[in-house]
Amino acid sequence: MKIEKFEEKQLEELMLFLDENLNENYERVVFLNIRKRWPEGFLTVIDEGKIVGTCCGAILPNDKLRVLILVLQNDYQKRGIGKDLMDRMIRASEIFGVKKVTLEVRKDSDAITFYRKLGFSSVDVLPCYYQDGCDGIVMEKQL
């Protein structure tokens, strides 16, 4: 298993992976734009030649890193891979002077516990934030 920067040639495989592992639907161009703006902040987890996880983020004004996506196939969860992805993204953001990391997570997601273990706190609720009407929880971590 290896973690590497997302490459444009992986786009079709990434879209299939996300369709299978997320409830949200995104246009392909979104991921190309994310990669273009900050390639070091867009990572994939590859095992046996297949994408089994990914994360991407964006550097925002006011010294913020916003985690846009962090997802792993179920059988790769709870193995430290998500923490490794988050740590790598945060390290890559340090050259921008990032002082705060923000993200949104589904109100009904087990990932809330994961993020709390990483030092994130819930700071807001976004009613009907997700495409299926589920509320989102805004979480933040000070660096």
Regions found by a protein language model. Give the residues of each.
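Extreme N-terminal starter segment of soluble prokaryotic enzymes
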Residues: 1-3
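Acetyl-CoA-dependent GNAT
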Residues: 5-75, 86-88, 92, 96, ...
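Active-site acidic-Proline motif in GNAT/NAT acetyltransferases
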Residues: 73-79, 107-109
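Short coil/turn segments at alpha/beta junctions that flank glycine-rich nucleotide-binding fingerprints
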Residues: 79, 96-99
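Short glycine/proline-centered loop/turn elements that form peptide/ligand docking sites
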Residues: 82, 86, 108-111, 128-133
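Conserved catalytic-core motifs of GNAT/GCN5-like acyltransferases
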Residues: 102-104, 116, 121-138
